[in-house]
Regions:
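Short loop/turn motifs at secondary-structure junctions and domain boundaries
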Residues: 39, 100-104
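Juxtadomain coupling helices with adjacent low-complexity linkers
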Residues: 15, 126-151
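Sensory-domain boundary capping and coupling elements
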Residues: 113-126
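Residues at secondary-structure transition points
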Residues: 5, 22, 66, 70, ...
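Regulatory sensory and allosteric helical modules in signal-transduction proteins
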Residues: 50, 54-100
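Short hydrophobic/aromatic beta-strand element in the GNAT-like acyltransferase core
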Residues: 44, 109, 121
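A short, aliphatic-rich beta-strand micro-motif
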Residues: 106-113
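Intrinsically disordered, low-complexity terminal regulatory regions
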Residues: 1-59, 146-151
Length: 151
């Protein structure tokens, strides 16, 4: 399967879906669905939002997921604690990885900021090792930048 993703097109599609929609859940639901339909070789795509000092499950596509993640735990919690994108080629080598789906082998998590604070994260998992590249990181960070402008 061709793994090339046109992130410029993906970002424009996101802008079209969310441009005139004032509802957070609606926009995040469509964003998760867009990623699910557009990215090859993934088994989960969605969001966690910061609530009461922890990450809470928000709209997603894929199997049922962990509902709460503590800051500093797992890939998502580390992304928040370090305020940095986590590109993990092999989650089984990541200290403290939380296995919500045992089929996941690689993961990318991008922090989302609103008004200068971490709002939450975009989390994408793959059953393939080394699924995510620096190109994916840059493209998904642009995708998140669009979301930051509407949340």
């Amino acid at each position: 399967m061709n793994r090339t993703v046109d992130y410029e097109l993906l970002t424009k599609q996101l802008e079209g879906l969310t441009g005139q929609v004032p509802y957070e859940i609606t926009n995040l639901s469509n964003a998760a669905a867009l990623l699910w339909e557009s990215l090859p070789d993934i088994n989960w795509a969605g969001f966690y939002k910061m609530e009461d000092g922890q990450l809470i499950l928000y709209p997603f596509q894929g199997k049922p997921a962990c509902t709460r993640i503590q800051v500093g735990r797992g890939v998502c919690g580390t992304a928040v604690a370090e305020d940095a994108t986590q590109l993990v080629p092999d989650v089984h080598e990541f200290p403290g990885h939380i296995a919500c789906d045992s089929a996941s082998n690689s993961e990318i998590v991008i922090p989302i900021h609103v008004n200068g604070k971490i709002w939450g994260v975009l989390d994408i998992d793959s059953p393939n090792l080394n699924r995510f590249t620096e190109k994916d990181k840059a493209g998904l960070e642009r995708f998140v930048a669009v979301l930051e402008g509407i949340l």
